[in-house]
Amino acid sequence: MDDIFTQCREGNAVAVRLWLDNTENDLNQGDDHGFSPLHWACREGRSNVVDMLIMRGARINVMNRGDDTPLHLAASHGHRDIVQKLIQFKADINAVNEHGNTPLHYACFWGHDTVAEDLVGNGALVSIANKYSETPIDKAKMPLREILKERAEKLGQNLTKIPYKDTFWKGTTRTRPRNGTLNKLAGIDFKQLSLSQKLNENQSGELWKGRWQGNDIVIKMLKIRDWTTRKSRDFNEEYPKLRIFSHPNVLPVLGACQSPPAPHPIVISHWMPYGSLYNVLHEGTNFVVDQMQAVKFAFDIARGMAFLHTLEPLIPRHHLNSRSIMIDEDMTARISMADVKFSFQCPGRMYAPAWVAPEALQKKPEEINRRSADMWSFAVLLWELVTREVPFADLSNMEIGMKVALEGLRPTIPPGISPHICKLMKICMNEDPAKRPKFDMIVPILEKMQDK
C-alpha cells in the first residue's frame, strides 16, 4: 500500500480512513519536506480527506519546512471550499512563511479572486509586507487590487504598509509535524538513548529528560523489586498496547527497553515542554490558564477519554488525574500512556486518591464500572481547572482516601464559577455511577462552551 501522503494527495478516502483507524498511525506526522497529510490534502483540493483529517484532530496550523501552513497551500491553489473550512476551524489567517508571505499573498498572486475576498472578509491583512517589501495588494492585479482595498477599508483595516520583521510572529509557536518514523520502532536499544537531566524521583521510579534518534524524549525508569522472567514477559505484553499514536489528545509510549540491558525496565515518550497539567496549574509556569484555556483543556481531555473508552478491552490501570495529562507545545492537553501502571507495579495501591471515584476506593477494580469512575475523575479535573487549586491540598493521601470513601468528603464548588461549568461538574460527579454521562456526550457540550 502506498504511504499516507500519497493517499491524501490522490484523495483516496477509503485508504485514508483505514490508515486512521490503526492506532499505531500518527496523523500529525510529516514527510521528508515536513508536509503533514493535511498539507497534501489541502494542496490537492481533496475536500473529503480534509474533512476526515480535521475530524480526527489534525493540527490546523502545522508548518512544513518552508513554514507554509495548510491554509497557504489551499489559498495558492484556489481551493475555496477548503479555505473556508480551515478558517472555520480557526486557521491562523495571517500566518507568515519563510518568505514573509501570508495565504492572502498567494491568493492575490495566482489571481484567485474569490479566495482573496474570503480571506480579507475573515480578517486577512492586505498591507502586511513580505521579506521583499511586497504586500498582498502589490501582488494583486486590477480590478482585484481595488476591490480588496475597498473591502479592507470598510472593515476598518489601516492600509499603511506593515513592514516585514522576523520577530513579528514570534508570539505564535511554530508547530512542526512529528517525526513519522518513531511509531515504527517499539523495542529500543538502550545504548541509543542519551540521558541529560533527572526530572523527578518517587516510589515508583525515576524520570529523566533525554534524546533518542534526534528527538527530545522523557525516559521513565521503573523501580521494580525482584525483576523476574514472569514480570519481564508481562512488561513485553503490556507496553505495546500503550503505543497509541492515532489520537491527538493521547500521548503514546514511543517504546520500551527491558532490563537487562537497561539498569531498570524503561518506557519512553515525547518530551512535552510545559510538563503536566499539574505543573501548569500549580507550579507557576509562564502562562496563565484563564477560563477559555481551562475549557479548551477540558475539551481536549474529554476527547482523549472518549477515544480511549472506545477501545476494547479498555486500557487497564489507567488513572485520570492532572499529573497524567501532558501539555504539548501548542497548548494541547494529551493523556499520557506512560503514566499507565503495569500489572506488576504495587497492585492495589492508590497513588492519587483525590481524583478517584468513591466506589473505586471502596471496591475491587473488577467490581466497578471503569468508564463511570473515569467520569468522576474528570469532574475533579474540571474543579481543578476552574479553581486552580489542588483538590484536598491540606490532607494526606491516606486521609483523602478514607474521607472520600467513608465520610462523604467532596470538592466544594466555590461561588463565582460559570453556571455551565458548575452544572457539568455536578452531573459528572453524580453519586450514582450509572447516572454519570459518557465522554462522547460531554464533548459537544464543551465544544459549545468553547465557542461562547
Swiss-Prot record:
GO terms for biological process: branching involved in ureteric bud morphogenesis; caveola assembly; cell morphogenesis; cell projection organization; establishment or maintenance of epithelial cell apical/basal polarity; fibroblast migration; integrin-mediated signaling pathway; mitotic spindle organization. Coiled coil: none annotated. It is found in: Cell junction, Focal adhesion; Cell membrane; Cell projection, Lamellipodium; Cytoplasm, Myofibril, Sarcomere. GO terms for cellular component: actin cytoskeleton; cell cortex; centrosome; chromatin; cytoplasm; cytosol; focal adhesion; lamellipodium. Mg(2+) binds at residue 339. ANK repeats lie at residues 2-30, 31-63, 64-96, 97-129, 130-174. Disulfide bonds: none annotated. Its main location: other. InterPro entries: Ankyrin_rpt, Ankyrin_rpt-contain_sf, Kinase-like_dom_sf, PK_ILK, Prot_kinase_dom, Ser-Thr/Tyr_kinase_cat_dom, Ser/Thr_Kinases-Pseudokinases. Gene3D superfamilies: Ankyrin repeat-containing domain, Phosphorylase Kinase, domain 1, Transferase(Phosphotransferase) domain 1. Residues 193-446 form the Protein kinase domain. Keywords: ANK repeat, ATP-binding, Cell junction, Cell membrane, Cell projection, Cytoplasm, Cytoskeleton, Magnesium, Membrane, Metal-binding, Nucleotide-binding, Nucleus, Phosphoprotein, Repeat. It comes from the Eukaryota. Belongs to the protein kinase superfamily. TKL Ser/Thr protein kinase family. Scaffold protein which mediates protein-protein interactions during a range of cellular events including focal adhesion assembly, cell adhesion and cell migration. Interacts with PXN/PAXILLIN (via LD motif 4). This is Scaffold protein ILK.
